[in-house]
Amino acid sequence: MADTPALIPQSDTTPRCWALIPCAGTGSRAGATGPKQYQLLAGKPMVLHTLAAFAAVPRIARTLVVVAPDDAFFASQTLTDARFLVAACGGSTRAASVLNGLNFLLGQGAARHDWVLVHDAARCLIRPDQIDQLIDACWQDDVGGLLALPLPDTLKRESLGRVAATLERADKWLAQTPQMFRLGSLLDALQVAGTTVTDESSAMEAMGLSPKLVPGSAQNFKVTYPQDFCLAEAVLMTRSSGDSAPQQSASEFKRASDMNFRIGEGWDIHALVAGRKLLLGGVEIPYHLGLLGHSDADVLLHAITDALLGAAALGDIGTHFPDTDARFKGADSLVLLTEAARRVRAKGFEIGNVDSTVIAQAPKLMPYMAAMRAQIALALALEVDQVNVKAKTAEKMGPVGLGQAMEARATVLLRKFI
């Protein structure tokens, strides 16, 4: 990367961090009557949740919201943080809005060597600590980078509505935002790449650069389709519930008796048979055998579901989703896990963390661990670092060791303020 120094602006002045939120889209895929970024989620417009996260990051000097020229939304809003700017310079594409916004920032005193974090308005679940994590990871980097997640699902190439091929996913990541680059470098890259690129990283890649991948969160998804609104609102409501819980002050320790802790244990085992998909932790794993069961037989999710229900004294998975009920024939275990978590929270509990183990002789599961954790965290409305998945073999002993079955164990911590 010998040409990098020529592209990256250099200065002796300490760079600042700016945030840029392109907010000029219409949100047609969301099925909303107006721009999706202004739809209410957990009691306030989606974009205001996004802005609140950036307002909580002291290292962000100013946050610019780029809206369409005829957008009057912010004229009716009172932005209490003086660091927010609104510019009616949105373009016909996302990249055009970003390009116009970068030029606007230069007019506001930003320098070419400053950092800019571009973030989708519809990624309203971003958290301040994730923004800080990206800044920490990229501050000394020659190029910059983006939040991203390893691809959790099997990737198919389509032709005429049918599967044409299954693609290798081990090196595939899902790009998220924020994406953090030097303002001048990104401006130059967008001018060269054009305004049809779908993210800032693509423009930088077109310049021959390799942005840094910084692990993000499964919760930091982009609200795109109608069903996404329900999931985003559930996460926001869960966070709101947690934020309203009693807090420990500097002068007062909270006694353990003020909080009700519950620990749940789950276990499950399923036989391996031909002709079934192998699903573990909500991730399809290439293998010549799959797990036999009434539902999709995801043994790991079943163990976690049992642990959740057990900790809340709500029985077990068979009580809530019996295999005698035709409604659960072939059921998606991620859906069952999400519903179990809802019932647990309805009793006033918060989920603290999940620890789990898959016992399988084959195949190798390590390449899929990150994707499993991401799927479980998303289903439970948790951060990825609240979910752990381990893999062990049975040392060729018993039905698991002989490759006839797979087993899973899980432990869950619940807590409730009393």
UniProtKB/Swiss-Prot annotation:
> Where along the chain is 4-CDP-2-C-methyl-D-erythritol 2-phosphate bound?
268-270, 294-295, 316-318, 321-325
Renumbered to this chain, region (2-C-methyl-D-erythritol 4-phosphate cytidylyltransferase) spans 1-261
- Mind listing the UniProt keywords for this protein, alphabetically? Isoprene biosynthesis, Lyase, Metal-binding, Multifunctional enzyme, Nucleotidyltransferase, Transferase
Write out the pathway annotation from the protein's UniProt entry: Isoprenoid biosynthesis; isopentenyl diphosphate biosynthesis via DXP pathway; isopentenyl diphosphate from 1-deoxy-D-xylulose 5-phosphate: step 2/6; Isoprenoid biosynthesis; isopentenyl diphosphate biosynthesis via DXP pathway; isopentenyl diphosphate from 1-deoxy-D-xylulose 5-phosphate: step 4/6
Give the Enzyme Commission number: 2.7.7.60, 4.6.1.12
Entries under PROSITE patterns matching the protein: ISPD, ISPF
The site (Positions MEP for the nucleophilic attack) lies at 169, 222
Which reaction does this enzyme catalyse, per its entry? 2-C-methyl-D-erythritol 4-phosphate + CTP + H(+) = 4-CDP-2-C-methyl-D-erythritol + diphosphate; 4-CDP-2-C-methyl-D-erythritol 2-phosphate = 2-C-methyl-D-erythritol 2,4-cyclic diphosphate + CMP
Fetch the NCBIfam families from UniProt.
Answer: ispD, ispF
Q: What is this protein called?
A: Bifunctional enzyme IspD/IspF
Gene of origin?
ispDF
